């Protein structure tokens, strides 16, 4: 089985069509190689990033832990995303995340700092309130929040989460990853966590969601506690639809997408498709 239950496999695999798939699900190669093949299947990064544009890449860099613990996005995925953006003609590629633990150490210990430098990206600090601006948005619950200025000042957003269990929301994937773009995350908890996560898409919807499912924390997330919490899935989900990316990824953790509040609410608000049977999905084994 590649990511989806048997009943969803017929009728959604890419057939003889000229249009790129809605979602690509990959397994069996290194994280960087999977992204290279997946973005090719989607029509190339030039479909999402135009020459001269500036890009914000948002991975998970929240935890002061090494790559092997699965708490942060695999650095090879981040590096390859940035390289493809640069090759598509991006003027600059910025990387942001409001880290939960010490940001300097999290950046370097995760390997993402080295990946950014190797690929020509620019890391922008997120640890001080002066980097954020308050904006109003048309959310059901979240109507105002402080957003990282990099997100507001640049053209394209790409969310690059690592798939994980989360004790508060069930899962953390592409949509919830964007909580790392705001200053006061406690505000979400005060006014309604799942609705606020979905509402944030009114600020800026990512053009691409790249879900790293190489090492996956399946319990005690989002940080994990030991190597026993991590399962090697050696997989990746890529889609221009963040709801579809989250729906497919949630099923990898044996969760029904409609049972995850923020995924369902984002779908109901029109930000993407939660019903995978309606999508053209290409599965690639490498």
What function would you assign to each model-found segment?
Residues 1-286:
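N-terminal and secondary-structure boundary signal
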